[in-house]
C-alpha cells in the first residue's frame, strides 16, 4: 500500500517540501514544492466596504514552483511535470507566526478569524522561464489586520486517469480522484497599519519574468519609498520644496567690451576707415546708385552740383572726448542749396548749436574752372511737404585730413532705429529735397572719386502704412427659434411686493379692467399678460 510520505530535502522545511507516492500501476512519483518568492510585507486593509476599494496586496506576490519526478529517487528520476495528466491547484491560508495565548472563553470566530482576503487559490501555470516547471502565483492576497503572520499553501490534485490513482484513498471526505497532497509554509512577514506601512517595493525580476509570459502580475517600476523618520512642520516642507525648485544662478560672464578710454592721444589721427564692416547695412546704405559720369583725369574737376559740400576733414563728433572738449550734440542734414561754391573760395564755417571749434580752414578740394558741369536732365522728385530745416553736425576743420562724410542720423548711438517708418503720400511736383547725409559710422573710402548719393531722387516715397479696413461690426444676434424665458414673458412675478401688495393679474390691465371695447374692436390677452386690441373690418360678407 502506497501512501504519501513527507520527506525533508533541506535544512529549511519552509523552502522546499517533497512527498513520494506509488500509483495503482506501481509508478513512483515525487512531488517537490518550492517557494521561489517569499512575501515580505503587507498593509492592513481593514474591514468594510471601504477596505475593499483600498486594498494593498502582499508584497512581493508569493510564487510557488511544482515539479513532478518519476523514478526510484529524485536524483535518478525523470521530470514529467509537463507530461503528467492531472490538474493541480494551491490553496493559501493565513496563520499567526507567534503562538497567542487565548482566554478561557473561546469560540470558533475567535480561533480562526477571517483576516485573509483576495484570491486564496491559484491554478498551476506551465512556464518555460525561469525553468520548465509548474508555477502557482498569488498576485491578489491581502490581510485585514496588522500583525506577524505566515502563509500556508496546500496542494490539491485532481487525477484524470484511473491508473494514477492511489492504492487507497487517503481522505474519504473528498470525491474520487481529488486528493490533498502536501503543505508548505512561507517565512513570517509583517503586516503594517496604513500609517506605518513603508510602501510597496519595486517588482522583482521573477515577477517581471512571470508577467512577460502572460500571467497576471502587477508590475511596479520606479517606486519611491516613503520616509517616516521625522515628520517636519508645514514650514519645513515648504522650504524643502522651494530648495528643490531653486537653481543656482550662473555667474555673469565678463563683458568682452572694455570701457572707453579717456585718453586724447588719438585726436590728431586720421578718421577711422573701416575696410570690412560686419554689420548689416540699412536700407539707405544698401541701395547702390547707378554709376554717374565723372572725369577723374581732368585737370580741373567740377564741384558737386546742387549739393552742400561736406565739411573738410569732418571728424565724427561722437569720437571726440577729453577734458577740454564737450560731447557734441548731433544735428540733422542741412537743407539743400541751389548754388555752387565760387572758384577757390573757402567754405564758410557753419554756426554750430553747441560749443564746437569755429576755426576756418581752406577747402581741401582743388581749384576748378568756372565751366558748368551737368549730369544730364533729371526729373524732379515729388514729395508731400518740404522737409523741415535741420541743423548740420559740427566738425573740426583740419586741412591735412582726408574727406569723410558724416551720418544723417539725428540720434545718439545708443538709440534704436524704429522698426516701421511712415512715409508721406506723393503729391504734385515740388522742388528737390536733399537726402540726409551719410552715417558717421559709415565713411567713404576715398576722398572725391565718388559722387554723393542722391537716393531721394532715385527712390520714390512709399505711401503711408495705415490700416486699410476697419474692424467688422459684430454680427447681429439671430433668433434661435427657442422658447422665451418665463421671466421675460411674466416679468410681473419678479417684482417685490411690499405692505400687503398682491401680484397684479396680467390678464386684466388697468386700461381695460371693467371696460367694454368698442363695437368694431376686440380685446385679447397675450402670453406675456398684455392686452391687445384688434379692429374688425367694417365690411361684412
UniProtKB/Swiss-Prot annotation:
- Organism field: Hypocrea virens (strain Gv29-8 / FGSC 10586)
What UniProt keywords are attached to this protein's entry? Cytoplasm, Nucleus, Sporulation, Transcription, Transcription regulation
Q: Can you tell me which family this protein belongs to?
A: Belongs to the velvet family. VeA subfamily.
Motif Nuclear localization signal in this chain: where?
40-45
* Entry keyword Cytoplasm: yes
The molecule here is called Developmental and secondary metabolism regulator VEL1
Q: Where is this region: Disordered?
A: 222-447, 464-483
Comment text on domains: The C-terminal PEST domain is a region rich in proline, glutamic acid, serine and threonine residues that is required for the light-dependent regulation of development and secondary metabolism.
Q: Where is the composition biased (Basic and acidic residues)?
A: 230-244
